[in-house]
Amino acid sequence: MSTASVIIIGAGISGISAAKVLVENGVEDVLILEATDRIGGRIHKQNFGDVPVELGAGWIAGVGGKESNPVWELASRFNLRTCFSDYTNARFNIYDRSGKIFPTGIASDSYKKAVDSAILKLKSLEAQCSGQVAEEAPSSPKTPIELAIDFILHDFEMAEVEPISTYVDFGEREFLVADERGYECLLYKMAEEFLVTSHGNILDYRLKLNQVVREVQQSRNGVVVKTEDGSVYEANYVIVSASIGVLQSDLLSFQPLLPRWKTEAIQKCDVMVYTKIFLKFPQCFWPCGPGQEFFIYAHEQRGYFTFWQHMENAYPGSNILVVTLTNEQSKRVEAQSDQETMKEAMSVLRDMFGATIPYATDILVPRWWNNRFQRGSYSNYPMISDNQLLQNIKAPVGRIFFTGEHTSEKFSGYVHGGYLAGIDTSKSLLEEMKQSLLLQPLLAFTESLTLTHQKPNNSQIYTNVKFISGTS
């Protein structure tokens, strides 16, 4: 049985940042157990059409504000190549099913209507929470352009997906990662600072890949972790950095069971599914000038192949288009073949650009929802929610601590939220370990009094000595 002071379950950005803080503060015997064959979690690069594409997190959001985004600092430090992204132009590049772009005036009016409706929705939710009735009910989008803008507004720009604090604190600019090393190189660079590496490969025994944790057993004396291949590990504490979707699934079991307040909070947190579908073409047939990186398809079904982006700014000559689907559309596409998805995407593109455009030569469809080690893309707390929900998800249970972007009070759903959450969780654990050390002399004194007032018993003496020594 392998032992450590702290076991960290998951090697995403939260797990890596948590481990780094522990090692830098003297807790060097950490053990990171990762279910897959790589570190990074939902930050994952894959080569497609001769260029690297980001299957999961792809942007550094919140740059240029009064405070410096810590992930932007890492990107600058390690010379990560990025490209500025401006979503705002997308609303003026909205195509109908006949291939015509909606006039600017109509697009502006529809966007204003959608914003006003979102504000009314927020006020209505606030009124419900306070037991009042809203003065005016928000309108629902009905036409294809209204549905498209509603999708863009809520799935890309508003607080239901993006915590406003990201933009208030760190700034409103967003940068697309376009580096051959991938976004994940930031994690490898972080790992190099506390793990043994060689030529970009992590060789340190404290990182164990392909270790699927299935059971976490907690007792007064420590925590035992069991994996799918039968391996058993023991530690004084455990940090669980699995995603909220994994916590909601049956992949991880806890003994004893987590308390009801914990499990109820975990189940109440929404999980967003965000799917970027990549299409490779023999040549470029879409507009590529200034302000045309993003474009929108207006359809009668909300979110149906709505949001498009070309990769020419990031990788000139790549001839790659990306279409983003979310939630139910994502789950629908994950359940069908890539060929069927390509057929649907081509039908949409021919609506916008005509029947003579070339057929895609390749397609890449990530499946975050059906990945049992991820079960979704990121957490999504309700626009109006009790802060107690997040606090309960975040709170430790005995020797088991929890981290991840879903435990970030201000930046849930973001890479920097996960990064900061790992740091915060390790700081809390270090404080817990410090308090435990301070209590040891008192516990030893209490146990010694117990020994002097009880009839000697070999097994009892052994138990007390074992507990006092701190070896259990």
Curated annotation (Swiss-Prot):
Coiled-coil residue windows: none
Tissue expression pattern: Expressed at very low levels in leaves, stems and inflorescences.
Reported cofactor(s): FAD
Pathway, per record: Amine and polyamine degradation; spermine degradation
EC number: 1.5.3.16, 1.5.3.17
Keywords tagged on the record: Cytoplasm, FAD, Flavoprotein, Oxidoreductase, Stress response
Textual note on the cofactor: Binds 1 FAD per subunit.
pH-activity note: Optimum pH is 8.0.
Keyword Cytoplasm in annotation: yes
GO CC, alphabetical: cytoplasm
Pfam family, one: Amino_oxidase
Sites where the protein binds FAD: E34, R42, V213, E405
Organism domain of life: Eukaryota
Effect of a null allele: No visible phenotype of seedlings under normal growth conditions. The double mutants pao1 and pao5 exhibit enhanced tolerance to salt and drought stress.
One annotated GO biological process: spermine catabolic process
InterPro entries per the UniProt record, alphabetical: Amino_oxidase, FAD/NAD-bd_sf, Flavin_amine_oxidase, Flavin_monoamine_oxidase
Regulation: Inhibited by guazatine, N-prenylagmatine and 1,12-diaminododecane.
GO molecular function annotations of the record: flavin adenine dinucleotide binding; N(1)-acetylpolyamine oxidase (3-acetamidopropanal-forming) activity; polyamine oxidase activity; spermine oxidase activity; thermospermine oxidase activity
Subcellular location: Cytoplasm
Catalytic reaction(s) noted: spermine + O2 + H2O = 3-aminopropanal + spermidine + H2O2; N(1)-acetylspermine + O2 + H2O = 3-acetamidopropanal + spermidine + H2O2; norspermine + O2 + H2O = norspermidine + 3-aminopropanal + H2O2; thermospermine + O2 + H2O = 3-aminopropanal + spermidine + H2O2
Protein family: Belongs to the flavin monoamine oxidase family.
Described purpose of this protein according to its UniProt entry: Flavoenzyme involved in polyamine back-conversion. Catalyzes the oxidation of the secondary amino group of polyamines, such as spermine and its acetyl derivatives. Substrate preference is thermospermine > norspermine > spermine > N(1)-acetylspermine. No activity detected when putrescine, spermidine or N(1)-acetylspermidine are used as substrates. Plays an important role in the regulation of polyamine intracellular concentration. Involved in the production of hydrogen peroxide in response to salt and cold stresses.
Protein name stated in the entry: Polyamine oxidase 1
Organism the protein comes from: Arabidopsis thaliana (Mouse-ear cress)
Taxonomic lineage from the root: Eukaryota, Viridiplantae, Streptophyta, Embryophyta, Tracheophyta
Gene: PAO1
